[in-house]
Amino acid sequence: MFNQRHLSAAPNQDQLIWKILFDRQTALLHRRAAPAFSQGLARLGLRREFIPDIGELSATVREHTGWQLAPVGRPFEPAAFFALLAERKFPIVTRIRAMHSFDFSPEPDLFHDLFGHVPMLLDEGLTDFLHHLGQAYQTQPAGSVAREQLWALYFFTAEFGLVQHEGQPRLYGAGLLSSAGEIHHCVNEHTPRPAFDLATVLRTPVTGTRYQNQYFMLPAWEQLTDCVAELAGMLATA
């Protein structure tokens, strides 16, 4: 899908890091990734040989779900991040992680965003969910508990969520899809993977500096959309 001559601007070191990460993650995700991710990856036509052009990816995403990609130099604070979601835009960090951060990157980077998030942005169920989160965040006052809860909901779904598929846990959160270390930790038999419960998720503390203590698993992909109405009710009575 992508013309390589438009992608040569990335430094050789960045291209090498992309290639190594792409190979490792696609191998690890075999029969572990959610169908929505695998389908999105195939539709985008991402390749191991070179870093894709963000503008071309954005055009493909817009064609499928109406969303756009917004290149940024570094991760946003939650308020700016959710404001973009409310506009059906997703920020893409333009720097890629260093070699020493292969297994775990505490902050989003180019690989995390392009490989982990963008394939999922071709799924209308997820993009509708993200849009609702962005809109809901905008209605809550700065510094409110509700905003903290909305961040937790985003974190334990779009970043570290699991979904049950054919009786097995499948990964759909970008923090899992893009991190070998996080995958190994998640699939460890001693790591808790409780069923997704909105009230529990909203009050679970968020940490981005280490592997997660637990990963919430949707019993079905449709529950992600269904929880939007439940969330609206909770915020209205808060």
Model-derived features with residue positions:
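The feature captures two recurrent sequence modes
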Residues: 1-121, 125, 201-203, 216-238
